[in-house]
């Protein structure tokens, strides 16, 4: 289908499902709304607007379904009724021909499939818009037979994606320029985010790298299993990972009859998530029930099994500090501190008044404290803070929105397992430990130890730097302001070098002594 024909199809679907009322209600040009009223044949206006939007996206195909799924995570931009409905979108499409999957594998590895795998199951076990999964057996580097899951990219996706993305970018530009809410909704930014997300999913090596990173991070935590990646069998279009065997986590009755401790399972999920967030700053961001199983094998009984690593989130130290302090200030009911954190983040316009933001946050948060602590949703706390921030034109960072969406998934899953789950009691030790690590002497020691070689290298250069500085003093007394400022900056740099160099020298000696002592004993 040509781009023009596809564009006509999209416009027809928008009008058929009455989405013009949703899109054009904030447009500055009344004549646009009048034109759309002329086209009334076959319109479906009896359902709520969120349902109509979901059905329209489903009728436009898998790329628009995935776009709706991404939109559902942007609850800082979407009204709750629309975000809730979009969260129901399912990325399910019929599997493609196994012969096409085999041809993709043979093209990727330039070998017949019989030379790549010991055996290959032609029947796919899962299928989505981007890829489908087959089971197979390989020989690893030691010659052992290993059961694996093979993810194969759906062929011909890139041209389809690029065509739909071009149309989305064009429509986003129209909405941003014509709608009164265009700037707040940031449609072009959302489409650009979706563009990056889709192209990341089209590179299965990237997903393999995400899985390998999570597996390495989680090795010391005996609560979760991450499949091993077989790099010799990975390609941009083919991903081969260890086959994991478990029970889907939403089959609670089956897990309970197998003897799994369900309340502990709920707590373990929270522990895994907060470990990934506050310890590692790298978290699995697609933890819905379809991507989580529970092992019933005797040696790993009751452990989580994580699958599908196409979406991950990363947090900087600043992001983690923002989250930890927001949560602790909220539970202390210190709304002024919450407001100050928003302003200190630099995401709030400079003219924002702390007391006004504090009052708005108090209005949102105070009703939560009429409930038992175990009923308070940290994900909803973040969501309400984001929604309040929107009124003050706060620029919420995408990684925090992704975390908020994932946190809601974790809470929903945890309370599905155990309605009495107290999320705060489970999360609090992580927040306290992380803040202690950030503020305590251990962090200072880690930073000094990391910089010791650099400071020790600077120290021998200090006499020469001091000599050069003294020789460059002006010969006359006429010194303008710019030269004074430049001289002051040079002096500050010199003093900083002296201080850091001295610290580095002392620290270097300590580290060397410690190293020698360890070698001796």
From Swiss-Prot:
Pathway: Cofactor biosynthesis; ubiquinone biosynthesis [regulation]
Residues annotated for ATP binding in this entry: 125-133, 151
Catalytic machinery residues: 286 (proton acceptor)
Primary residence: membrane
Superkingdom as given in the UniProt entry: Bacteria
Cellular localization per UniProt: Cell inner membrane
Enzyme Commission number(s) from the entry: 2.7.-.-
Sorted UniProt keywords: ATP-binding, Cell inner membrane, Cell membrane, Kinase, Membrane, Nucleotide-binding, Transferase, Transmembrane, Transmembrane helix, Ubiquinone biosynthesis
GO CC annotations on file: plasma membrane
One biological process term in Gene Ontology: ubiquinone biosynthetic process
Domain Protein kinase: 119-497
GO molecular function, one term: ATP binding
Transmembrane residue ranges: 496-516
Membrane topology field: Single-pass membrane protein
Matches recorded under InterPro entries: ABC1_dom, Kinase-like_dom_sf, UbiB, UbiB_bact, UbiB_kinase
HAMAP family noted in UniProt: UbiB (MF_00414)
NCBIfam families named in the record: PRK04750.1, UbiB
Function: Is probably a protein kinase regulator of UbiI activity which is involved in aerobic coenzyme Q (ubiquinone) biosynthesis.
Family according to the record: Belongs to the ABC1 family. UbiB subfamily.
Full protein name: Probable protein kinase UbiB
Protein's organism: Acidovorax sp. (strain JS42)
The organism's taxonomic lineage, starting at the top: Bacteria, Pseudomonadati, Pseudomonadota, Betaproteobacteria, Burkholderiales
């Amino acid at each position: 289908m040509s781009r023009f024909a596809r564009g006509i199809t999209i416009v027809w679907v928008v009008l058929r499902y009455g989405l013009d009322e949703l899109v054009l209600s904030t447009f500055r040009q009344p004549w646009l709304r009048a034109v759309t009223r002329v086209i009334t044949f076959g319109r479906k206006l009896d359902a709520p607007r969120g349902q109509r939007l979901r059905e329209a996206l489903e009728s436009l195909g898998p790329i628009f379904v995935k776009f709706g799924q991404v939109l559902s995570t942007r609850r800082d931009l979407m009204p709750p009724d629309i975000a809730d409905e979009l969260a129901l979108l399912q990325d399910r499409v019929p599997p493609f021909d196994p012969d096409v999957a085999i041809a993709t594998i043979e093209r990727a590895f330039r070998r017949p499939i019989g030379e790549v795998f010991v055996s290959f199951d032609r029947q796919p076990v899962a299928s989505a818009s981007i890829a489908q999964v087959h089971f197979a057996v390989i020989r690893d580097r030691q010659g052992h037979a290993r059961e694996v899951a093979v993810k194969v990219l759906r062929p011909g996706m890139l041209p389809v994606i690029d065509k739909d993305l071009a149309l989305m970018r064009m429509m986003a530009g129209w909405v941003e320029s014509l709608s009164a809410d265009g700037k707040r909704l940031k449609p072009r930014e959302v489409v650009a985010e979706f563009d990056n997300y889709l192209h990341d999913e089209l590179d299965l090596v990237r997903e393999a790298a995400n899985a390998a990173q999570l597996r390495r991070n989680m090795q010391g935590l005996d609560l979760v299993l991450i499949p091993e990646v077989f790099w010799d069998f990975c390609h941009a279009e083919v991903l081969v990972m260890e086959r994991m065997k478990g029970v889907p986590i939403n089959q609670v009755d089956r897990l309970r009859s197998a003897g799994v401790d369900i309340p502990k399972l709920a707590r373990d999920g929270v522990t895994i998530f907060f470990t990934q967030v506050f310890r590692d700053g790298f978290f699995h961001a697609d933890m819905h029930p379809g991507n989580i199983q529970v092992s019933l094998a005797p040696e790993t009984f009751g452990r989580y099994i994580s699958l599908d690593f196409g979406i991950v989130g990363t947090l900087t130290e600043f992001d983690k500090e923002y989250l930890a302090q927001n949560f602790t200030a909220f539970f202390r009911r210190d709304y002024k501190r919450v407001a100050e954190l928003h302003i200190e983040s630099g995401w709030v316009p400079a003219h924002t008044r702390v007391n006004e933001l504090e009052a708005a946050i108090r209005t949102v948060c105070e009703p939560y404290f009429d409930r038992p602590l175990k009923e308070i949703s940290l994900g909803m706390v973040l969501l309400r803070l984001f929604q309040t921030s929107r009124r003050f034109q706060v620029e919420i960072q995408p990684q925090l929105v992704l975390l908020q969406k994932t946190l809601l998934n974790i809470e929903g899953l945890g309370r599905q397992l155990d309605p009495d789950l107290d999320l705060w009691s489970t999360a609090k030790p992580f927040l306290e430990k992380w803040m202690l690590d950030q503020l305590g002497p251990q962090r200072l020691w880690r930073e000094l130890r990391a910089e010791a070689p650099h400071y020790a290298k600077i120290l021998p250069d200090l006499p020469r730097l001091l000599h050069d500085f003294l020789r460059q003093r002006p010969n006359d007394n006429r010194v303008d302001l710019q030269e004074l400022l430049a001289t002051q900056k040079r002096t500050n740099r010199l003093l900083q070098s002296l201080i850091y160099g001295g610290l580095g020298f002392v620290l270097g000696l300590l580290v060397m002594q410690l190293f020698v002592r360890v070698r001796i004993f």
